[in-house]
A protein has these predicted regions:
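...with weaker cross-activation on analogous glycine-rich loops/strands in unrelated enzymes
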Residues: 114-177, 182-184
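Active-site nucleophilic cysteine motif
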Residues: 78, 90-109
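SH3/SH3-like beta-barrel superfamily modules
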Residues: 22-55
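Soluble non-cytosolic domains of exported or imported proteins
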Residues: 18, 68-72, 92-97
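Beta-loop motif signature
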Residues: 3-34, 86
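Short, basic/aromatic beta-hairpin or loop at an interaction surface
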Residues: 1-11, 107-122
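Surface-exposed beta-loop interaction hotspot
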Residues: 1-2, 6-8, 12, 46-86
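Aromatic- and glycine-rich peptidoglycan recognition patches
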Residues: 1, 16-18, 58, 155-221
């Protein structure tokens, strides 16, 4: 059973007024044990059992069949994370850091990519960004950090999802949209000055090491 809501609870009984067993977040997977009314009975890796509302979860096969992995669906999911607080090392809909936002959004579409921005930067297709951003597409990842010099290579320290028109969504303080256009009200001068390059990842899922769907990942078998 896959949790499809950003946040919720699993309960001791098939009743939301009963004692919670744990909280759950989007993408959590629990073992199906049966159904009772509007609930799935599920079990945890440690043996605990609980009831999970069908309104916030789906059987894995049903969930996967309904999945969309196109750019617009992924961006829509990213927008649904707006306002979620920044949490260093966070990778859930309760709190994220910059690379955790990217990883969490993609995981909600059954896509697994490396955890850290410094790893995410070197998968897929590297794109040197044109001055007018004409070669960057919606859904590309944009990376920021220390620019390379003759003495040392670049240092990746931040990542966001490109939305088009020099706008990107990222986690810094919280999840929000910033602009790399000085004329925009949400202009982010700090990150614009340290923009490095973009990465196009979607065409390379299940074709390149480090980027796959859960049904192709041994850990989830």
């Amino acid at each position: 059973i896959v949790v499809t809501s950003h946040y919720g609870f699993a309960y001791e009984k098939p009743d939301e007024s009963s004692q919670p067993v744990s909280d759950v977040v989007a993408g959590n997977r629990l073992k199906w044990e049966g159904s009772k009314g509007h609930f799935y009975q599920v079990s945890y890796p440690d043996g605990r059992k609980a009831y999970l509302s069908k309104s916030i979860s789906q059987p894995e096969a049903e969930w996967r069949a309904s999945l969309k992995q196109d750019v617009e669906s992924i961006i829509e999911t990213a927008y649904s994370m707006m306002g979620i607080p920044y949490l260093w090392a966070g990778t859930s809909s309760k709190g994220v850091d910059c690379s955790g936002l990217v990883r969490t959004v993609l995981f909600m579409h059954d896509i697994i990519i490396p955890r850290d921005a410094s790893q995410q930067a070197y998968v897929g297709e590297h794109i040197d960004i044109a001055p007018d951003f004409s070669n960057v597409k919606r859904g590309d990842l944009v990376f920021f950090g220390r620019k390379a010099t003759a003495e040392r290579k670049e240092g990746i320290s931040h990542v966001g999802i490109y939305l088009g028109n020099k706008q990107f969504i990222h986690a810094l303080g919280d999840v929000h949209v910033s602009s790399m256009n000085p004329a925009d009200q949400n202009y982010d001068e700090f990150n614009t000055k340290r923009l490095l390059f973009a990465v196009r990842f979607l065409p390379y899922i299940n074709k390149e090491k480090g980027m796959n769907t859960t049904n192709k990942n041994p850990f989830y078998q």
